[in-house]
């Protein structure tokens, strides 16, 4: 069983990923989590497996209030929960721009053409404003 009671998650800097989320999944029940990029899907999953902690509210998994789980108890809780995340295959020491540019550079495109193509691709997927960020600063769906 998984239950969220008025759960919020706010990151350093004030960015709020979740705001007062409440739901319950019974034992054996299946659910699909969908939403736009930055909606908080990955954050919600990270709370369930204790990769992160809620800023407010309660997360209950199999009857255990995760707010009360010590660092030493985290592995035992995780052994009873399975989560599959998206696999990005990104280089974390390079910016979003550099990650998109790398195969074009390897393929021999001119720097001007690389820039044109990278910016067109980022624009198409709504990430133009994120080109100078590193992958760790992106939400799971970005």
Q: Where are the model-predicted features located?
A:
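The feature captures the beta-strand-to-loop junction immediately N-terminal to the Walker
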Residues: 34-36
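Helix-to-loop junction immediately C-terminal to a conserved catalytic motif
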Residues: 49
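Conserved ABC transporter NBD signature motif
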Residues: 57-65
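Conserved ABC ATPase "signature" region
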Residues: 64-65, 105, 112-130
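ABC ATPase NBD coupling module
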Residues: 66-82, 108-111, 115
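Short coil-to-helix segment of the ABC ATPase nucleotide-binding domain corresponding to the Q-loop/switch region
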Residues: 93-103
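Conserved ABC ATPase signature
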Residues: 134-142
């Amino acid at each position: 069983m998984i239950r969220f009671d008025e759960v919020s998650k706010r990151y350093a800097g004030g960015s709020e990923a979740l705001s007062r989320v409440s739901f319950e999944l019974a034992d054996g029940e299946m659910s699909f989590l969908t939403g736009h990029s930055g909606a908080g899907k990955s954050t919600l999953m990270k709370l369930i497996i204790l990769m992160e902690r809620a800023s407010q509210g309660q997360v209950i998994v199999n009857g255990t209030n995760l707010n009360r789980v010590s660092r030493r108890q985290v592995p035992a809780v995780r052994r009873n929960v399975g989560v599959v995340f998206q696999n990005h295959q990104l280089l974390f020491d390079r910016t979003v721009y550099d990650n998109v540019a790398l195969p074009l550079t390897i393929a021999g495109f001119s720097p001007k053409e690389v820039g044109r193509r990278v910016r067109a691709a980022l624009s198409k997927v709504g990430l133009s404003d994120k080109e100078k960020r590193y992958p760790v600063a992106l939400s799971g769906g970005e």
